[in-house]
Amino acid sequence: MPQINASIVLYHNKKEQLAKAIESFLNTNLDVKLYLVDNSSNDELKDLKSIDSRIEYIFNNANLGYGTAHNIAIKKSIDEKVSYHLVLNPDIYFESGVLEKLYSYMQNNSDIGNIMPNILYPNGEIQYLCKLLPTPVDLILRRFIPFKNWKEKRNNTYELKASGYDKIMNVPVLSGCFMFLRTSALKDVGLFDENIFMYLEDTDLSRRIHTKYKTIFYPKVQITHEYAKESYKSKKLLKYHIQSAIYRSEE
């Protein structure tokens, strides 16, 4: 039985970038398995499964959404009684040893439901991905209000920048780009909300886990995220972001 399963949701991604994420996860002495869950309109990425025998490729033949696609793999992990499931973005990469350190910390702290390492840009700068619980007003104002000083002050508070990001913290909201999840916690609080097609599904899940377990930022380990704010570039994606914020606030 694997010690850790992981899932990467695909949607017409670049194979070169995906290969870095895949190789990062599989470069471990732990017993692992990786699900590639493909939401693309064709299966041109299926040959990625030939990289390693520990990969299982799932083609949905439709864009089911981020959370729904990850849930397909998470349910398999739960059915297989795997202790941990890693939700992994396709633009993440990291050195050997990262999984071992996170696995060990989770094994020694059974009250943790989700753990996130320190996440860096490719140039080495910190990505401030520890968050307070947002409201729809926060999300909309941070996107549209032109007052730079006001936005910066609000962002500093919202992203917990005063903490220095140099100590272990129990944080209400952790990023969905790398969610190292305890499957027993997921059985307790539920999986991704499939009513949220895109954006804030990670916020919602992190919030629910945080009500019963610790959700830990662990800066002793670091990974790299080739991050891009896609919702800022696309009106359609921004619409999904706002709809998700409104839906979450109505729960």
Q: What name fits each language-model region?
A:
Residues 93-129:
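Conserved donor NDP-sugar-binding/catalytic core segment of glycosyltransferases
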Residues 81-93:
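Short beta-strand-to-loop acidic/aromatic patch adjacent to the donor-nucleotide binding site
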Residues 36-47, 62:
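A conserved acidic beta->alpha catalytic loop
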Residues 61-80:
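Glycine-rich, basic loop-to-helix element that forms the pyrophosphate-binding segment
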Residues 13-27:
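Short, well-formed alpha-helical segments that are part of the catalytic scaffolds
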Residues 134-171:
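Short, flexible, basic/aromatic active-site loop/helix in glycosyltransferases
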Residues 164-166, 172-222:
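A short, conserved alpha-helix in the catalytic core of glycosyltransferases
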Residues 250-251:
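Conserved small/polar residues in nucleotide/adenosyl-binding loops
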